[in-house]
């Protein structure tokens, strides 16, 4: 329970009920920001982390490009997905309704769209993630965090054209891949802006 409304007003557990009070009780909200009301939990707004099933590989890449912690491995079966989701407090995104019926699973969402771009917009809307997009935060390949790195430290890994043209670089903490803000970055930025 994260929210109790009595007669339309937010109250805490200590509220004493009166005759005729109308009560509504709500779980943790995923798709709207309820920052300015009386929360019953110490940290109601969450760090949104996902784990995706085998059907959502392209959605995984879009979510990582937007900076969201997104776990995906097409070799995982349903039981492994549920185990990881529960251990790491991840939301399962799936096209498999059967997976969502698992009694051990506490947080999941059935992705309705079939087009990867539309799926991405669906997830942004469903979990109210517009304001949380952070480009150049996660590696689209392995989900590792990207950290700024000085060009001098990676000179030997860059092609001459890249060395001359770009000055801002990032390295993945997971797979050591190097990224820079080239034309692909502008395309990603434009793509993300389409969903606002």
Residue ranges and their predicted role:
Residues 18-25:
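Loop/turn positions that initiate beta-strands
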Residues 144-148, 180:
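Short functional micro-motifs and their immediate structural scaffolds
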Residues 14, 157-168:
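Short linker/helix segments within small regulatory modules
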């Amino acid at each position: 329970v994260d929210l109790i409304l009595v007669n339309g007003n937010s109250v805490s557990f200590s509220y004493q009920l009166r005759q005729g009070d109308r009560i509504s009780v709500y779980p943790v909200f995923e798709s709207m920001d309820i920052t300015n009301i009386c929360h019953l939990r110490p940290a109601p707004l969450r760090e949104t982390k996902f784990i995706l099933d085998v059907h959502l590989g392209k959605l995984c890449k879009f979510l990582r490009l937007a900076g969201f912690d997104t776990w995906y491995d097409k070799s995982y079966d349903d039981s492994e997905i549920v185990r990881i989701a529960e251990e790491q407090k991840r939301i399962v995104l799936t096209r498999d309704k059967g997976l969502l019926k698992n009694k051990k699973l506490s947080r999941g969402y059935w992705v309705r769209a079939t087009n990867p771009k539309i799926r991405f917009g669906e997830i942004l809307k469903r979990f109210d993630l517009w304001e949380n997009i952070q480009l150049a935060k996660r590696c689209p390949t392995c989900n590792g965090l990207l950290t700024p790195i000085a060009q001098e430290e990676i000179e030997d890994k860059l092609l001459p054209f890249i060395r001359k043209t770009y000055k801002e670089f990032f390295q993945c903490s997971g797979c050591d891949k190097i990224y820079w803000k080239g034309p692909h970055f502008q395309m990603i930025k434009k793509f993300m802006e389409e969903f606002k």
